[in-house]
Amino acid sequence: MNILGIETSCDETSAAVLLDGRIGSNVISSQRCHTSFGGVVPELASREHERTIVSIVNSAVTEANITKNELDCIAATAGPGLIGAVMVGLCFAEGMAFALGIPFVPVNHIEAHMFSAFIPESPEHKSPEGPFISLTVSGGHTLLSLVREDLSYDVIGKTLDDAAGEAFDKTGKMLGLAYPAGPVIDRLAASGNPHFHAFPKALTSSSQTSRSYRGNFDFSFSGLKTSVLTWLQKHPAEFIQTHLHDIAASIQYAIVSVLTEKAVAAARYFRTDAISVAGGVSANSALRTAMQEACRHHGIRLYIPGTVYSTDNAAMIASLAGLMLSKGAVRKNNYDVAPFASFAAGAIKASLK
């Protein structure tokens, strides 16, 4: 089955083709127009998607070495995301599927991230097998989920305020770094001292990694932002610039420590031997290293996508659509799916009942 996937939930316009269970193409266009604003401007994002989506889809189909008439299905993000941005890809995909007379499959963007570590890059790829803990970390979401054998899941922890990616970007802005600041902090931290200053790690405890831990698995990063701001205000600009690498490393260490401790604690608490880490923040080198070391220490299998599949991309949309079709989780000829802005577990599945 040949599946075209389309992703436009935020500031990446992406299209990919899944060819009989393997990725045939994955084209991504990242919007640069938001840099001077220090964040994504929704209206600009929508207009950029409108401007580029036709060429991106054409490129994906061409790179896959097929024609549009050889497509068997089209899938697109229906949410969560910036509602205007989501609508561009969703409406385009629904219209294209209707015109070609083939099924349309709506995909939950966060669920696509959850299973992105299992994107079929080759015939030998590992299919997702539950139960496992999924840590999904991005600019807009930070979630811990327990994925069962049938690949249904429960959200067991979420951020109470800011997402991890947002914490990176906002603390980076305090340091005068360009948007998006997450990758910049990662690069600076590589040559910094993560123990230069101990920033707070909210909702963690020394007992959290034990099987008997009875706390929650929620996250909070607003306190970290406040702490960073307060600390920076106490030091002169020259001092901050001199120790910029160390400060970046200390901020990154605080965020990564929380994510790693929570994920491992959840795996041990629910007695699972596997963790999947996905979302834009999963591209962070310190998080990847920390998760690898922690999982190795506790005998836990770690699944983490290549960095090209960590950020928003259409390959994960096409891949999850293929999985959904194989499980009979969607109905065919569904051309009237409404977009949604906020995450709700199983939102698409519920809308199809």
Curated annotation (Swiss-Prot):
Coiled-coil positions: none
Role description: Required for the formation of a threonylcarbamoyl group on adenosine at position 37 (t(6)A37) in tRNAs that read codons beginning with adenine. Is involved in the transfer of the threonylcarbamoyl moiety of threonylcarbamoyl-AMP (TC-AMP) to the N6 group of A37, together with TsaE and TsaB. TsaD likely plays a direct catalytic role in this reaction.
Cofactor note: Binds 1 Fe(2+) ion per subunit.
Example GO BP: tRNA threonylcarbamoyladenosine modification
PANTHER family: TRNA N6-ADENOSINE THREONYLCARBAMOYLTRANSFERASE, TRNA N6-ADENOSINE THREONYLCARBAMOYLTRANSFERASE, MITOCHONDRIAL
Residues annotated to bind Fe cation: H109, H113, D312
Organism, scientific name: Chlorobium limicola (strain DSM 245 / NBRC 103803 / 6330)
Name of this chain's protein: tRNA N6-adenosine threonylcarbamoyltransferase
